[in-house]
């Protein structure tokens, strides 16, 4: 019996020392239920426990990103020991049709960046909108068949060509390609056996004459 009690005491002592030595694992995820006050105040409070463990790592502006790649910068508001998603939050909520009763899961990805998964009142993950800014960026460097280079869907010319200048340069390149093609065809014609035979017959006639 004494041995058993001593063993329990040692286990308790080791467990106590381990809990004191091991730092508390930082919280990476938290969820928020959208309340009427959230919609009214146009900002969302970050849970106090997350603020206590990770708040010192957050910069003045954080990034929220959805699984669809939609990103927005949100400015934080600090009130005492509280931290709120503030400027930019209402626009993010509006873009994703976030309403009272929606459930949001936040995952901290370091560098003041959060991944946000949104569940609507059906308790299912919502359909995320595409990021218009991201779409425009992905359309950069589009080259049409006339050889003119544009940016995105706005038709802004990236190079320094004017309309006429671009056409002139395009025509110049076309002439260069035509000359190169003619040279290749000429070389092929010279290598043609019939062409070589004709040249030999011509040489014989000149020699006989």
Swiss-Prot record:
Residues 1-25, 154-176 are annotated as: Disordered. Residues 1-14, 154-165 have a biased composition (Polar residues). GO terms for molecular function: DNA binding. The keyword Transcription applies. PROSITE patterns: B3. It holds the Pfam family B3. Transmembrane segments: none annotated. It comes from the Eukaryota. GO terms for cellular component: nucleus. Residues 29-122 bind DNA. It is found in: Nucleus. InterPro entries: B3_DNA-bd, DNA-bd_pseudobarrel_sf, Plant_B3_domain. Keywords: DNA-binding, Nucleus, Transcription, Transcription regulation. PANTHER family: B3 DOMAIN-CONTAINING (PTHR31920), B3 DOMAIN-CONTAINING TRANSCRIPTION FACTOR VRN1 (PTHR31920:SF37). This is B3 domain-containing protein At3g18960.
């Amino acid at each position: 019996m004494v041995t058993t009690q001593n063993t329990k005491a040692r286990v308790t002592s080791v467990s106590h020392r381990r809990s004191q030595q091991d730092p508390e694992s930082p919280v990476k995820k938290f969820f928020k239920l959208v309340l009427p006050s959230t919609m009214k105040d146009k900002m969302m409070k970050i849970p106090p426990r997350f603020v206590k463990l990770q708040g010192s790592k957050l910069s003045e502006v954080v990034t929220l990103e959805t699984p669809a790649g939609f990103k927005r910068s949100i400015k934080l508001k600090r009130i005492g020991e509280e931290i709120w998603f503030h400027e930019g939050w209402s626009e993010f909520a509006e873009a994703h049709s976030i309403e009272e009763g929606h459930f949001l899961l936040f995952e901290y990805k370091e560098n003041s960046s959060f991944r946000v998964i949104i569940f609507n009142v059906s308790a299912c993950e919502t359909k995320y909108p595409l990021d218009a800014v991201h779409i425009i960026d992905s359309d950069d460097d589009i080259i049409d068949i006339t050889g003119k280079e544009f940016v995105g869907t706005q038709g802004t010319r990236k190079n320094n060509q004017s309309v006429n200048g671009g056409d002139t340069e395009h025509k110049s390149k076309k002439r260069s390609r035509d000359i190169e093609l003619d040279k290749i065809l000429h070389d092929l014609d010279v290598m043609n056996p019939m062409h070589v035979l004709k040249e030999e017959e011509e040489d014989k006639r000149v020699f006989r004459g």
